[in-house]
Amino acid sequence: MSDTVRVYEIAEEAGASSQDVIAKAKDLGIELKSPQTAVSYEDAEEITKYMMTGKSERLATKPAKVKKVVKKEEVKKETEEIETPKEKIETVQKVEKEIIKKPELKKVEISKPISKAPQKSEEESENLENPNKIVPKRKGLVIIKKKRPKEEELEEQQTITENQSKKQMKSLSEILGGVDDEEKSYNEPKNKENDDIKKQKVKKEKKKPLIKTQDHGKKLDVDREYSDEFASSDDSLLGEEIVLLDMDLSDSYKIFDEPKPQNIVNQSRSSKPAAFGNVPQGLKRGKRKKRIVRTQEKAEITSVTIPEDIRVYEFAEACGKSPAEVITVLFSLGMMVTKNDFLKQDELEILGEEFGIEVTVKDALEDVNYVETYNDEEDIDTSSFVTRPPVVTIMGHVDHGKTSLLDKIRSSKVAAGEAGGITQHITSYTVTKNGQEITFVDTPGHAAFSAMRARGANVTDIIIIVVAADDGVKMQTEEVISHAKASGCPIIVAMNKMDKETANPDMVKAQMAEKGLTPIDWGGDIEFIGVSARTGDGIEDLLENILLQAEILELKADPTAKAKATVIEASLEKGRGPVANVIVQNGTLKIGDNIVCDTTFGRVKAITDDNGKPVKELGLSQTGTVLGLNEVPTTGSVLVAMDTEKEVREIATTRAEHARAKELSKSTKVSLEEMSGLIAEGKIKQLPVIIKADVGGSLEAIKGSLEKIANDEVKVKVVHAAVGGITESDLVLAGASGECIILGFNVRPTGSVKAKAKADGVTINTYSIIYDLIDDVKHALSGMMSAVIREENTGQAEVRDTFVVPKVGTVAGCLVTDGKVIRGGHARIIRDGVVTYTGKISSLKRFKDDVKEVANGYECGIMFDKFNDIKVGDFIETFIQIEEKVSVDD
């Protein structure tokens, strides 16, 4: 760093312009030419001190500049004349002390002569006549008159009474408030000495030119807040502005405004260090601050509780890991996933072991598990318990007489109303026997209704397995036995069709014993009862056994509790809306109850019993239909009554959102081994279908059956499946899906829908028997499959000689040894047991004539398509290709 300072840097530090610094330096005897002139540190400090305080050691030792020589004895007199009250306002304490000590005096320069009084005193006249008197040079005081007083105003001021002119004037220091005692004691004798002197301005004979100085002080308007008395005096400063240059009223009496404090942070960023003192020197580029990164030590995660359905990134957040770490671990195990894929239970366990974290899986629907809440919160009051009727489910193979047996018990003809004579809906009825009610649930026996049968087994107390005595145990019978054993309910075997001559009850007992159901008379615990749905034989014994089993079970429930029921079937009926067929398991279901059923909710609007009659309530184990739900409920779901509509709405909405998110977010992750399978699956032909059914149970059965119809080449793609009639929106969806077929089960399209379907080219097929629907879909899939090409050998020939025909090719002279050779047929050339060529016969001749075929034992000439490498001893095998269609079942 250099030992000099520039003038402009001194000006910045002193808060003045460079010209002021040059002028002040000239007073101190330092010659400066321009703001870029370099000054030593000592001179710079002296100039700054002089500009700030008005004092300097060099100024004290400097010889006084006196323009005119005057007599010494007149100095004191001139000083007294200058010390007027006006000057006391405009001077400062330290300057007055310097006058007493007779320092070097500077001339006071007045901008304009003031003539306030027409008559002048003798002393003033003498002063004007002797302009060579020494006038002390005052530093930093210039009085600038803003307005020249008019003659009328001067005359008015002259008429002011002498008493007013003698009033004590306030000094500038007193006005500014802050004059110390020393200054007051010094001013008091001066005031007394000057009481007789008129308060007038000191004038000069000639008007001196005003020295132009840089205005680096603050203008002070002294007439702002003072009394009228002061404003009306002769020496008032009204209409004038005083420019105070470098005044020093000591450090505590500075008139100029204090500079605003600068932001230290901003100053440090935008200015470079000062040459001296603490004043910024100039702009500089601030250094880039280092960002302080506060690292918080994260607590190590040892265990997490996560929902059942969780994505990769959600699991990573819960474990405090990045998704990349989780994906890397799964990739090392041969699993290709993205951060949006769902994780399975075994994958969560593997990740937990890999990261050393205990993973606990929580059911996302646990908080809205209304069934569990109902079972836990329901007060058990045994005093309110009553015996409830048993719920009996009839199950068995198709066409074994289940519905006919139930019709005989109810004395009705339900089976006659079923399409094709087979049950395709799950139904329930209540029968009274000896004053006791029994609720029967009839299930379909077809293979497609496996889920229906399982649902019937879950809501029942007693299961009756119907087996035809002449037919024995069949496929669906074995399935029914499995459902019955899984339910843990008592089982009764009804051997139907005992009126037939071919009935063989012992065969049925033996077959059932092989399946684990041993009759009582064979030493087992299963009751076998022979019945006939046609004649009614054995039905009374069957009902008595049912009541006996119910008595042993001691079935009881609380009819005063809130209702709990199971939906065994659901549908959407025109004019009624969503309808649920339910069996009450506990409590009493009444009209007006707020109910929730899985993802649906509502208020019970109407109830009908099993005969279709409207009732106000359903009691224990009674069956009926309920209206009032907002949507068609899921078959097999539990219906519960609650206190408020808000409660049921929140539960249903939450469960619906979860179900929808789960459906839309099916995982797309595959293993590395499955990649080739996916590539091959892209070649599989699909048959898109839309399924509409009358009830939810049938819809479920049809959808499950169609999805099972698939092989390596074709499969069924269910675009949409719903309960209800065929609407125009289904046609729009079918058109958008491309070559989509609409399948209706027990539903019919209206005339307008048919017309629109014909115009749009959409195929609608309706069925009333599930067999027909499945068979038609199989035929459609079979038509989509490629035909199988089968080869059939037609003959064989041996090459005896070869002939080369120019520009034609090689002709093989052959002898037909087996069958016949056909022109245009396929042929293989076999040489030493190896097939060297497979192609077509382009030309066949016998002697010189073209022939269509040559039989066994005859010679012929054969040419092949684009092949001439024929040798003697080759064998020619001819064959034809036959295309054969295949079915899905094959």
Curated annotation (Swiss-Prot):
UniProt entry tagged with the keyword Protein biosynthesis: yes
Region feature G2, mapped onto this chain: 421-425
Region (G1): 396-403
Signal sequence annotation: none
Gene Ontology molecular functions: GTP binding; GTPase activity; translation initiation factor activity
Segments for region (Disordered): 110-216
Record keywords: Cytoplasm, GTP-binding, Initiation factor, Nucleotide-binding, Protein biosynthesis
Basic and acidic residues bias (residue ranges): 184-199
Region span, G3: 442-445
Domain (tr-type G) ranges: 387-554
Entries under InterPro entries matching the protein: EF-G-like_DII, IF2_II, IF2_N, P-loop_NTPase, Small_GTP-bd, T_Tr_GTP-bd_dom, TF_IF2_bacterial-like, TIF_IF2
Major subcellular location class: cytoplasm
Composition bias, Basic residues: 135-148, 200-210
UniProt family annotation: Belongs to the TRAFAC class translation factor GTPase superfamily. Classic translation factor GTPase family. IF-2 subfamily.
Functional description taken from the UniProt entry: One of the essential components for the initiation of protein synthesis. Protects formylmethionyl-tRNA from spontaneous hydrolysis and promotes its binding to the 30S ribosomal subunits. Also involved in the hydrolysis of GTP during the formation of the 70S ribosomal complex.
Name of protein: Translation initiation factor IF-2
Source organism: Aliarcobacter butzleri (strain RM4018) (Arcobacter butzleri)
